[in-house]
Amino acid sequence: MKRYLPLFASAAICAALPVSAQEAKTHPAPSEIVAAAKADDWVAIAPSDILVMDLAPDSKGKPRRVVIQLMPAPFSQGWIGNIRKLAAAHWWDGTSINRVQDNYVVQWGDATEKKALPEGLATVGAKDYVTPDWPTKNRIFARADGTPDAYARTHGFYGGWPLAQGREGLWPVHCYGMVGVGRNLSPDTGTGAELYTVIGHAPRHLDRNIALVGRVIEGIEHMSSLPRGTGALGFYEKEEERVPILSVRIGNAAKDVPAFEYLSTDSDSFAAYADARANRRDAFFNVPAGGADICNIPVPIRRKGN
């Protein structure tokens, strides 16, 4: 089963209406559509699919927690398996945020590059940057139909995640807040011990060149607001500039982790939300864009019960 998102259809209908009819109709903002979504349009995120990173408190003593949702199968599972092992071994405890590059990424891991990795980490091949198409009957791939993609044949959503699609298959895309695996030059693909998150304009040129393993769903402000590094590529040059990481745990092994849920991308509510993101017709906007980059349709995520 496939669900297509009519990003252009409603704009065309609206353009054909008399001015008086258009003025008489009010269009909800994307946030209003999300707020009105039915309870069963929301999908719970399992605690076992959450990575909780606690940073050292800020200069005012306030705690800083970053919550990351890991990608579901079949995407990037070799690296995600490594991340689970690293978290279980408490490997990130005592490491740090080492790089903050403006309009690009925040990166964390072992700044010394000397800390021993736990045994049993997988070596994952670059072929796993892309997932071959699996049978249509096993998936719902909601396409943002009609909106061109500069980096792929098409794009859409599966299970709450933005994906691009080409002849070779499907792959996750570098939108704001996505989390990826740092690596050296090919054929190295990284273990998952060095991670980064996007804090700027979506660097889609990295798609299929680096493994994406998740996205920040809460607390990205604790990283995006950090002082920019002054070294090459935004690395911190002094040890005291680095932000200590107190702990990283899988959600069901961490304390005081709230429940999270995302708006199902195969729901009618999400289809309406995506259309509204592509064709803004609420009060502030005079000219609907008639389309949207996939990274401009962020999947709504909230604390359960909010």
Spell out what each predicted region is:
Residues 1-4:
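Positively charged n-region of N-terminal signal peptides that target proteins for export
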Residues 21-306:
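Cyclophilin-like peptidyl-prolyl cis-trans isomerases
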Residues 6-16:
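Bacterial N-terminal signal peptides
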